[in-house]
Amino acid sequence: MIEVIYDKDKEKDKQESNEKNEHEVSVNLRLPKNIRQIGSPDGHKRIYMEDYVVTYLNYIARPGSTQARGAILLGESKKSDAGDVIFISGAVDAQNIEFDMDESEFTQEAWTTIYDQVKQFFPGLSVMGWFLSRMGFSTAINDKIEKMHVENFPGKDKVLFITDSLESEDAFYMYEHGQLVKQKGYYIYYEKNE
């Protein structure tokens, strides 16, 4: 037999704690205050992408570019009491990778070039996933895209951000339960210029 005990005082304390500050996820993690919500992000996994990165990725995926384009997303992942939080604060154009979905691959040479750029322009940031722009192909993924993700970006905290600039659609995917799962939304955050 399982006995469930309800402590009214603990529940009240927990509710007050949750109401204090929605931007304070845990003692060590403070979320950006100046944000824009896209979609309906899940409370257990949050993705925050810096506005600069969004602008850069939009430039890469600009309308008129008929070829698939890609970039490597950089940032950090944090664990908190409220769940996992991924911050994307940089991106490196993957010019040296041909994004033809039938032949795409991240070679050792491509990764060497990417890591050299990361070290030079974004020291301290980690690879958090990748960006793919496919004009006119929607934000749906196929087996080849999923295979590329699993082979090159293993782990639960790695993301795929895919756009279709023709339809002005975008979506984040994360690897969950053995497959890439489309996320319900994300946040764009704005840093103050110093």
Give the ranges of each region predicted by the language model.
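N-terminal beta-strand/alpha-helix entry module and adjacent surface
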Residues: 1-129, 135-194
